[in-house]
Swiss-Prot record:
Belongs to the Rpn/YhgA-like nuclease family. The lineage of its organism: Bacteria, Pseudomonadati, Pseudomonadota, Gammaproteobacteria, Enterobacterales. It holds the Pfam family Transposase_31. This pseudogene is the N-terminal fragment of low activity DNA endonuclease RpnD which probably yields 3'-hydroxyl ends. The intact protein can be seen in this entry (AC B7NGZ6). Expression of the repaired protein increases the frequency of recA-independent recombination, but also decreases viability probably via DNA damage; in a RecA strain expression has no effect on viability but does induce the SOS repair response. May play a role in horizontal gene transfer. This is Putative inactive recombination-promoting nuclease-like protein YjiP.
Length: 103
């Protein structure tokens, strides 16, 4: 089993579970909007390297990147796990920064 370094044990637990294809597929079947589920072939999920995320960002969150076949071609599903113990008025900007790192 892969060991992950994270600031909270909750992040490590979710990241460990969501790096398993069957668990990730079940999670996405439950949580992705129907329109997106219908576009994606979740049986084609492939775990990708998240090494593109710089060390400063890596210290702030746990991230998982899955590639997936879609009706339109290849695509990606980026899972960001962020447990907050208090309100963060800048959360939307932080999530945007994480997403931009993937691009």
């Amino acid at each position: 089993m892969t060991n992950f370094t994270t600031s909270t044990p909750h992040d490590a637990l979710f990241k460990t579970f969501l790096t398993h294809p069957d668990t990730a597929r079940d999670f996405m079947e439950i949580h992705l909007p129907k329109d997106l589920r219908e576009l994606c072939d979740l049986d084609s999920l492939k775990l990708e390297s998240a090494s593109f995320v710089d060390e400063k960002l890596r210290a702030l969150h746990s991230d998982i990147l899955w590639s997936v076949k879609t009706r339109e071609g290849d695509g990606y599903i980026y899972v960001v796990i962020e447990h907050q113990s208090r309100e963060d008025i800048h959360m939307a900007f932080r999530l945007m920064r994480y997403s931009m790192a993937v691009m």
